[in-house]
Amino acid sequence: MGTFNEFVTRADALADETFTEYTVTKRRFEAAERKRAETPVKHGLVSAEYAVRAAKAEADYLEAREKYETVKRGLPEKSSQMAAIRADFVAAVASHFAADPAKLDKATLALLESGILKPGEYERLMASAEKDENFTMIRLIAAKAAEVADKAPTREGEAILKAVAMRGRNADGGDYIRAFDVGVASLFERCLRNPSLYSSWDMLMQPVRDAL
């Protein structure tokens, strides 16, 4: 389970609740609509048994229609609930990737300021910080690599340093937020607009579950 899977689980629960409620009420409304069409209320001479069935069919139809319309009117609120999940997710990402003085590695900082590091050594320092998920040091190493890249003695060294700098720029959690926006929030809105996608939610969400 990924670091931010809690928010995917919350989104899944909201989608399941929303799509199930909509699907069930729509199905019941359509069934009541068919029953009403089969036994319409008639004026004039009809049997008591038919009159009772027709009246019940009409009442069932009106009740099912009202429930269905209520569910449809409530869909914008579901969007608001997804927006709240996203807000919590963004806050969690910001906290996870925030610079933390407690994570400063003074020995590595001294090396970065010494001027003796070769491009490959920047790369090794970055790999070590990434392994430790030390985002404070990742960003510091990246910033220093970007600062010295243009001074590299070779084009190969410059390319290595720029690659290290790029890895640090991606260590702010932005990729996670973009993945949630596209793979969760936007997908949910598309499903709300197009109920035929409801049954595909699990399949379409799987890549995001794996990523987060």
Describe these PLM feature segments.
Residues 2-16, 51-151:
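Long, charge-patterned amphipathic interaction tracts in eukaryotic proteins
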Residues 18, 25, 46, 57, ...:
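A general marker of short, structured functional hotspots
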Residues 147-212:
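C-terminal modules of long, charged coiled-coil scaffolds in eukaryotic assembly complexes
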